[in-house]
Amino acid sequence: MGRFIFLSFGLLVVFLSLSGTGADCPSGWSSYEGHCYKPFNEQKNWADAENFCTQQHTGGHLVSFHSTEEADFVVKLAFQNFGHGIFWMGLSNVWNQCSWQWSSAAKLKYEAWAEESYCVYFKSTNNKWRSRACRMEAYFVCEFQA
């Protein structure tokens, strides 16, 4: 009886110590602060990459950053897996919801935008953001909440 209780307690300790770690993420995914991340070694345009991420796991999307530490973790993950490269993140102006205003403070009434949308990427060598046309291809990192 004492051996059963000891074994049960031991299993409980192991289970509790694994919660909140990489054990919450599927094989091949990396865990950080309750989210799972995976860089993919194939290039897609931004929309196709986002669509791909939504198909990988419920709640999946292109990576979004909410702290320097999170960005550093993902940049390091991308570099360790694939070396140098550029990777899409989930930030874009695809929906063109920017609030534009003329320097004269006049309201924008006339528009003649080109159809080009811009999306944001990071280099696997640092976590500085840059933008490029969403139609161009890049590697990407998917994320979902564990």
From Swiss-Prot:
Ca(2+) binds at residues 64, 70, 143. InterPro entries: C-type_lectin-like, C-type_lectin-like/link_sf, C-type_lectin/snaclec_domain, C-type_lectin_CS, CTDL_fold. Residues 1-23 form the signal peptide. GO terms for cellular component: extracellular region. GO terms for molecular function: metal ion binding; toxin activity. Belongs to the snaclec family. This is Snaclec coagulation factor IX/factor X-binding protein subunit B. It comes from Gloydius halys (Chinese water mocassin). The lineage of its organism: Eukaryota, Metazoa, Chordata, Craniata, Vertebrata.
